[in-house]
């Protein structure tokens, strides 16, 4: 998926640690959500290879989204990965690590809407007879 031999520089490691603190203290994320978001960001930064996460622009983020959509992820997983990236860049912008937020227009894939399940007339009658 990505080159795991490429090491993140110390600054990016610090961004991730600060981001995890932000998610814990200010967003009150659960440990599970925190771990998922951190993993998503590490994967993204490793995918960037030698480019700093602070230099990525909207086109680079879209390129990453096209990359992850080639895998057999559920739409909910892709939506979470996008949410992770959007939250990360919002954090970087808020902390003034970047001058503009390239993820502000990034949108998640639409989740399919399903129709509600309904009772058959026989099931309704059976319920009414048992009351």
Regions found by a protein language model. Give the residues of each.
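N-terminal core-binding DNA-recognition domain of tyrosine recombinases/integrases
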Residues: 2-6, 17-32, 38-115, 130
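A detector for short, charged/polar N-terminal pre-domain segments
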Residues: 8-14
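Two-component histidine phosphotransfer core
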Residues: 118-119
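Short, intrinsically disordered, charge-balanced linker/junction segments flanking boundaries
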Residues: 125-131
């Amino acid at each position: 998926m990505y080159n795991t031999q490429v090491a993140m520089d110390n600054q990016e490691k610090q961004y991730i640690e600060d981001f995890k603190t932000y998610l814990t203290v200010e967003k009150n994320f659960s440990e599970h959500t925190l771990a998922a978001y951190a993993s998503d960001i590490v994967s993204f930064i490793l995918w960037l290879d030698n480019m700093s996460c602070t230099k990525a622009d909207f086109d680079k983020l879209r390129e990453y989204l096209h990359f992850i959509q080639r895998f057999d992820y559920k739409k909910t997983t892709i939506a979470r990965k996008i949410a992770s990236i959007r939250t990360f860049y919002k954090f970087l912008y808020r902390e003034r690590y970047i001058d503009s937020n390239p993820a502000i227009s990034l949108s998640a894939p639409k989740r399919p809407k399903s129709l509600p399940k309904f009772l058959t007339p026989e099931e309704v009658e059976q319920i009414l007879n048992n009351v």
